[in-house]
């Protein structure tokens, strides 16, 4: 039916044409990130409209920085963000896999297989794949040697800039995660990554990065006359200015007597003095604020022997308040409009100290019962430090997920190859058209080992064929069960047991990756019509056609 018959003020594309467009857009997105995949992947340089540069090979970061207009491509960008939030790593894998599934699904549609059949086949394949990972491929962490967690961190770093120093950084990551270990009210062990602050200090080499006990702030005390160390700290968290109160612009005060003018000035000073005395009387000896503190206020704090720190990040303040049992206040006024400072808003810490680290001064909040840690990264330039921060964050997320879920799988394309063989066997037992969809799903999974090999400048066909042979043997010959952990060794151009080699990933990362990629592919595959409405004409333009 044409647009004229439907009276649509816009463009309408339907059927195979819209699918072809969607697949083209999604493939274009996957092509951007696929060369950055794996331990020998390349980096991307992204320059925005104001000229700031980002150099990274993190899939989620690359896609976030690109301004994408196509709606189907946007789904893939959201997919990588979701993977980043849920797991922290595997963002490139999920995009490549979703694009491959879509490409193959589109080929099936061209061969007159109905999209509904493909969707149900993909759903079945996804369910079977996850079941197989949980029952056969996943390994409980209790059965592994003690240093397995170091290998998890190293695997996560293998594709990043810090790969050369992965031994050094994996130890820092593990130590930081161990320090923030907590047990919640249900008795579950949790590793809150928010309690780990990552600071970047320009200069020196990456290997001079350090781990500091306590939560570090990239700030200094507001005045040199203040103490640099306070033990048994009671901390006030403020999200407002501590400055002399001035009347707003545009307000008028008519004064008939000169003395009244002086009285107004005195009252302005007294208001701020009263506020500070309220804070000090509550017992606070450390004041952290996100805004400024003027000289008049500093004088009162110095006299009281208080430590005051201004211009803290709001995020940092919230985290410290949470760990110290305090509250961030946005005003001292209560519901009646009177100003007071409730002592319950104070946070308690063992010690707040200003420490010198290399060329920088830092404020460190130490608390023995509420654990926190800070990683201070050193590097040659800002671009390198930003990429190091992303790598460390991904690694922290992966280690957290592994410790909380308690199961791992071998990396290097082992899971995808095993699932490909397994799903092919399942497809052979199907008597319906779903067989085609499951078979294509199985073939799509091989894009992961293929892309790993291509990026490492190796013969992908040869390596993937060997890998498939190993996994086929593992699933048919009971004496070769250990072959199920076979993955690629990209540095030596061979297939090896990646469980023994220490190339490990959390099982949850693989499961979520397959789930998210399948769901996204299905979402885009279901679209068979695209209607783009023309933008409304602006007011005062052509008024023809109004009032129908």
UniProtKB/Swiss-Prot annotation:
Which PROSITE patterns does the protein's record reference?
TCP1_1, TCP1_2, TCP1_3
Q: Which CDD domains match?
A: TCP1_alpha
The answer to whether UniProt assigns keyword Cell cycle to this entry is: no
Its keywords, alphabetically, are: ATP-binding, Chaperone, Cytoplasm, Nucleotide-binding
Question: One Pfam annotation, family name?
Answer: Cpn60_TCP1
Query: Where is it found, in Gene Ontology cellular component terms?
Result: chaperonin-containing T-complex; phagocytic vesicle
According to the UniProt entry, its GO molecular function terms are: ATP binding; ATP hydrolysis activity; ATP-dependent protein folding chaperone; unfolded protein binding
List the SUPFAM superfamilies. GroEL apical domain-like, GroEL equatorial domain-like, GroEL-intermediate domain like
Q: Respond yes or no to whether keyword DNA-binding is given for this record.
A: no
Q: Where in the cell is it found?
A: Cytoplasm
A Gene Ontology biological process in which this protein takes part is:
protein folding
Q: Which InterPro entries match?
A: Chap_CCT_alpha, Chaperone_TCP-1, Chaperonin_TCP-1_CS, Cpn60/GroEL/TCP-1, GroEL-like_apical_dom_sf, GROEL-like_equatorial_sf, TCP-1-like_intermed_sf, TCP-1_chaperonin
This molecule's function is given as: Molecular chaperone; assists the folding of proteins upon ATP hydrolysis. Known to play a role, in vitro, in the folding of actin and tubulin.
Quaternary organization: Heterooligomeric complex of about 850 to 900 kDa that forms two stacked rings, 12 to 16 nm in diameter.
Please report which protein family the annotation says this sequence is part of: Belongs to the TCP-1 chaperonin family.
Could you tell me what this protein is called? T-complex protein 1 subunit alpha
